[in-house]
Regions:
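A short, conserved structural fragment
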Residues: 75-85
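Short, hydrophobic-biased segments on the C-terminal half of alpha helices
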Residues: 71-72
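Short, cationic-aromatic polyanion-contact patches
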Residues: 27-36, 52, 85-107
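Short coil turns linking two alpha-helices in DNA-binding domains
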Residues: 27-28, 63-68
Length: 114
């Protein structure tokens, strides 16, 4: 991507604000401070592993409240799915294109650091 000519700081701020107000898929997901930590933890779970919010919180090193705050986002973006008729509610990593792409991105990033 080529560098664009210098912009006026106010224009750059307006562009940034516009992106934040209408985020693309990646920004929509990662604009939340704890979501990358949750996704990183989810990507290290064994396939098919079911978990509660408390178990995910312990695995990720965050509070249960943090997991509760972002559960709807993780469900909405097909990263996790709820196990029907589970009590307490249980979740698992979704078998979705989003998760597949996250695994591939994670692997590529890990490989680039070797």
């Amino acid at each position: 991507m080529s560098e664009s000519p210098s912009k006026h700081p106010a224009v750059e701020k307006d562009t940034k604000e516009a992106r934040l107000e209408n985020p693309s898929g990646v920004l929509y997901l990662f604009q939340h401070e704890s979501v990358p930590i949750l996704i990183d933890a989810i990507l290290t779970l064994p396939p098919g592993r079911e978990f509660t919010k408390t178990e995910l919180a312990d695995h990720a090193g965050v509070t249960r409240q943090t997991v509760s705050k972002y559960t709807d986002l993780l469900l909405e973006t097909d990263i996790v799915e709820e196990i029907p008729n589970s009590s307490p509610r249980r979740y698992r990593v979704a078998k979705s294109t989003v998760v597949q792409e996250l695994f591939e991105l994670n692997s590529a990033l890990n490989a680039s650091g070797e």
